Amino acid sequence: MTMKIIQTAQAPAPVGPYNQAIAANGFLFTAGQIALDPQTMTIMGEGNVEVQAKQVLTNLGAVLQEAGCGWENVVKTTVFLKDMNDFAAVNAIYGQYFDEATAPARSCVEVARLPKDVLVEIDCVAVLPT
């Protein structure tokens, strides 16, 4: 199996021993993205889940683009929420990137804590274009 590391300066550098994404066997597997500004590495929208969700999806989009993918290539996402009461607010932002007719499969879970105490984290799996 051939694996290719995907990295871009348009998304935050990893905050641990992992890569932004790995391309393997026709798929792209992204690391979870949080609301870090790629240039300053500071949290955007502290305490504001809408601002954080937008930054998360902006970061995720940059990783997808670096791999030659777009939102239309995404087949699965996982959304991690600090508080499930933010579900509707995150869905409103998420829906700006994925419409109901073409949205990928998704899991959404509430977790006790996320890196850097953010409110939302999202990762995805995409099919690489041929």
From Swiss-Prot:
GO molecular function: deaminase activity
Signal peptide start and end residues: none
Gene3D superfamilies the record matches: RutC-like
InterPro entries: RidA, RidA_CS, RutC-like_sf, YjgF/YER057c/UK114
Matches recorded under Pfam families: Ribonuc_L-PSP
Annotated GO CC locations: cytosol
Protein family membership: Belongs to the RutC family.
Name of the molecule in the record: RutC family protein slr0709
